Amino acid sequence: MASLIQVRDLLALRGRMKAAQISQTLNTPQPMINAMLQQLESMGKAVRIQEEPDGCLSGSCKSCPEGKACLREWWALR
C-alpha cells in the first residue's frame, strides 16, 4: 500500500502521470490513488491537467460511443 508521500515523490520524479500509471507503478488500487491525488490537490500540492480533445475527428465527444475516453487527465506537482 502506497503512502501520500510516495505518490508525491513519484510525481516529483516523473513530472506528470495519469492516475492509472501511478496505481500500476505503486501497486495500489486505483480508487486509493484517486483519493490520494484529490487530497494532494486539496492541500495545494498537486494539480489536475485535462487535455483538450483535439484528437477527436468529429468534434462531438459528448455523443461519442466511447464516452469521454478521449479526454485524458494528468496529474503533476504544483
Curated annotation (Swiss-Prot):
GO terms for molecular function: DNA binding; iron ion binding; iron-sulfur cluster binding. Pfam families: FeoC. Iron-sulfur cluster binds at C56, C61, C64, C70. InterPro entries: FeoC, Tscrpt_reg_HTH_FeoC, WH-like_DNA-bd_sf, WH_DNA-bd_sf. It comes from the Bacteria. Keywords: DNA-binding, Iron, Iron-sulfur, Metal-binding, Repressor, Transcription, Transcription regulation. Transmembrane segments: none annotated. The keyword Iron-sulfur applies. Gene3D superfamilies: Winged helix-like DNA-binding domain superfamily/Winged helix DNA-binding domain (1.10.10.10). HAMAP family: FeoC (MF_01586). May function as a transcriptional regulator that controls feoABC expression. Belongs to the FeoC family. This is Probable [Fe-S]-dependent transcriptional repressor. It comes from Escherichia coli O139:H28 (strain E24377A / ETEC). The lineage of its organism: Bacteria, Pseudomonadati, Pseudomonadota, Gammaproteobacteria, Enterobacterales. The gene is feoC.
